[in-house]
């Protein structure tokens, strides 16, 4: 596939494997980048046999003899000069600096990309980028995905829109690049103080993040960092560890295209590549969905919600894939608003059953109820904390039965009407779970109906209240004890 093994007869020159390095002073670096003959700083090449100027032209470089070049004509007749022999392995040094498919990717870059993928395999984009030498890891990945994987002629690129130019246009482009380099060099000589250095990886990363996900991440806090750590998300690499469908690469681990493959085997391997491409697309879709919806960080909308309201929001997470971000946020607001209204209606109905006749009374009742629940929760916490300390003493002491007054008053704390009840009535309210205001209201209504003659037995009082008939029976029995009702 690559030029590094084209005509080498099992010989591999390590200096030619990755020849585009960051050191621009390397002569090998310029062998494929010099387009204009005699360009300044590019160096000239002469045929070592006929001494013809072959700068900027296709030439033959011997892989055994150091710094030995031949023109096409001398190579075709088998010219030899000691110590060079005509049977030495050689390399064709072409001029591939023109754009082929993309304006910012030369044909030389395309060949180095495919050669790097053949050597290091899919997924090792850092090594592939090092092999190309002029592109970053993100640029190599994006270019391979857009040009090769998403090509309608997969696995081949779409060659119907090749950015071809004639020789004059290519020379003009190269001359323009050389003029730009000269201008930059002059600027550096005039202004020796260089601007502040910016880490190239950071700038590339920021541009890649903005391009892929459409925005920067929110400012991280300690809570946010803990959520990111729990999700095993590496912010700097923008990867999960492990990734979704982490075993997808195992399909290609041992697969290799060979020259002796049958058409059926070749088609089968291409089908495996298509399946692998789809699995990568699904992995990318899920990752972009998580980043776009900001699922790695707490939702600001849920910051002021109660625990019950957060539970309601979590139940709707399964519908997030069917909505846009704005639609899902609107759904959460509507559901939370509905939950609050339903809860408010239940509280008001409970207050109404308790005998409240105004909003102020209902608020006082609900406030006392919440206060009582908080006190009971604190008491349970204290009792559980002290249980370990008094466990030994409990084993040595005889069991003490709690007083009936304490048990009866336990559920009646906070009701001023409880002062109007006797001990037996308090016990009745505790057993049947009736609050004092409701009990007094039932007693008043039943007494009024008994005096009018509408209630002569227990079953007659069932229609007066929309509660459990057993509670009505207990209240009626209490009126019988007081002599108001008759059996």
UniProtKB/Swiss-Prot annotation:
Traits of the deletion mutant: Plants have pleiotropic effects on plant growth and development, including dwarf size, aberrant root development, and short petals and stamens in flowers. ADA2a cannot rescue any of the mutant phenotypes.
Q: Could you tell me which InterPro entries the record lists for this protein? A: ADA2-like_ZZ (IPR041983), Ada2/TADA2 (IPR016827), Homeodomain-like_sf (IPR009057), Myb_dom (IPR017930), SANT/Myb (IPR001005), SANT_dom (IPR017884), SWIRM (IPR007526), TADA2A_B-like_dom (IPR055141)
Q: Region (Disordered): which ranges?
A: 1-25, 368-388
List each copy of the SWIRM domain by range: 401-487
Q: Composition bias, kind Polar residues: at what positions?
A: 1-13
Write the record's keywords in alphabetical order, separated by commas: Acetylation, DNA-binding, Metal-binding, Nucleus, Stress response, Transcription, Transcription regulation, Zinc, Zinc-finger
Which segments constitute the SANT domain? 100-152
The record's tissue-specificity note reads: Expressed in roots, leaves, stems, flowers and siliques, with the strongest activity in the meristematic zones.
Q: How is it modified after translation?
A: Acetylated in vitro by GCN5, but acetylation is not essential for biological activity.
Result when mutating residue 216 to A/R: No phenotypic effect
Which one GO biological process term can you cite for this protein? regulation of transcription by RNA polymerase II
Q: What is its main location?
A: nucleus
Q: Which residues bind Zn(2+) 2?
A: 62, 65, 84, 88
| Modified residues annotated as N6-acetyllysine in this record | 216
Q: Which GO terms describe its cellular component?
A: nucleus
Report a single Gene Ontology molecular function.
Answer: transcription coactivator activity
Q: Where in the cell is it found?
A: Nucleus
Please list the residue ranges that the record marks as compositionally biased, kind Basic and acidic residues. Answer: 368-383
Which residue spans match zinc fingers labelled ZZ-type? 42-98
Subunit structure comment from the entry: Interacts in vitro with the HAT domain of GCN5 and with the DNA-binding domain of the transcriptional activator DREB1B/CBF1. Interacts with BZIP11.
According to its UniProt entry, what is the function of this protein?
Required for the function of some acidic activation domains, which activate transcription from a distant site. The exact mechanism of action is not yet known. ADA2 stimulates the acetyltransferase activity of GCN5 on free histones or nucleosomes, probably by opening up the promoter region. Mediates auxin and cytokinin signals in the control of cell proliferation and might be involved in repression of a freezing tolerance pathway at warm temperature. Involved in the positive regulation of salt-induced gene expression by maintaining locus-specific acetylation of histones H4 and H3.
Q: What is known of its domains?
A: The middle domain of ADA2b is sufficient for interaction with the HAT catalytic domain of GCN5.
Protein name in UniProt: Transcriptional adapter ADA2b
Q: Which organism is it from?
A: Arabidopsis thaliana
């Amino acid at each position: 596939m690559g030029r590094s093994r084209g005509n080498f007869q099992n010989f591999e020159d390590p200096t030619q494997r990755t020849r585009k390095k960051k050191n621009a002073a390397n002569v090998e670096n310029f062998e494929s980048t010099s387009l204009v003959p005699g360009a300044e700083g590019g160096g000239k090449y002469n045929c070592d046999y006929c001494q013809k100027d072959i700068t900027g032209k296709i030439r033959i470089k011997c892989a055994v003899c150091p710094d030995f070049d031949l023109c096409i004509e001398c190579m075709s007749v088998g010219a030899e000069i000691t110590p060079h022999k005509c049977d030495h392995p050689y390399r064709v040094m072409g001029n591939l600096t023109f754009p082929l498919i993309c304006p910012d990717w030369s044909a030389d870059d395309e060949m180095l990309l495919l050669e790097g993928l053949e050597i290091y395999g899919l997924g090792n984009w850092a090594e592939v980028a090092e092999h190309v030498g002029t592109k970053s890891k993100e640029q190599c990945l994006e270019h391979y995905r857009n040009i090769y994987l998403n090509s309608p002629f997969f696995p081949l690129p779409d060659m119907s829109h090749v950015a071809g130019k004639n020789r004059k246009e290519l020379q003009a482009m190269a001359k323009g690049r050389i003029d730009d380099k000269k201008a930059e060099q002059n600027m550096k000589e005039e202004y020796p103080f260089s601007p502040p250095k910016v880490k190239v990886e950071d700038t590339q990363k920021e541009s890649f993040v903005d391009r892929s996900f459409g925005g920067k991440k929110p400012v991280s806090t300690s809570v946010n960092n803990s959520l990111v750590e729990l999700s095993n998300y590496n912010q700097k690499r923008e990867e999960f560890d492990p990734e979704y469908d982490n075993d997808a690469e195992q399909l290609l681990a041992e697969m290799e295209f060979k020259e002796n493959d049958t058409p059926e085997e070749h088609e089968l391997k291409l089908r495996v590549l298509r399946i692998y491409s789809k699995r990568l697309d699904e992995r990318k879709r899920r990752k972009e969905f998580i980043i776009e919806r900001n699922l790695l960080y707490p939702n600001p909308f849920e910051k002021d919600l109660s625990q019950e309201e957060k539970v309601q929001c979590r139940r709707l997470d399964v519908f997030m894939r069917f909505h846009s971000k704005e639609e899902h946020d609107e759904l959460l607001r509507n559901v939370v608003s509905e939950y609050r209204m339903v809860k408010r209606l239940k509280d008001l109905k409970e207050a109404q059953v308790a005998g409240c006749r105004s909003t102020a009374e209902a608020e006082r009742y609900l406030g006392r109820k919440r206060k009582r629940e908080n006190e009971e929760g604190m008491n349970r916490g204290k009792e559980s904390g002290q249980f370990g300390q008094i466990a030994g003493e409990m084993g040595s002491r005889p069991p003490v039965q709690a007083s009936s007054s304490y048990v009866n008053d336990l559920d009646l704390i906070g009701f001023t009407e409880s002062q109007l009840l006797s001990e037996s009535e308090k016990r009745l309210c505790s057993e049947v779970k009736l609050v004092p205001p409701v009990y007094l209201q039932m007693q008043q209504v039943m007494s009024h109906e008994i005096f009018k003659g509408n209630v002569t037995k227990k079953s007659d009082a069932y229609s007066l209240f929309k509660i459990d008939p057993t509670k009505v029976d207990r209240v009626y029995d209490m009126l019988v004890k007081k002599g108001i009702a008759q059996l």
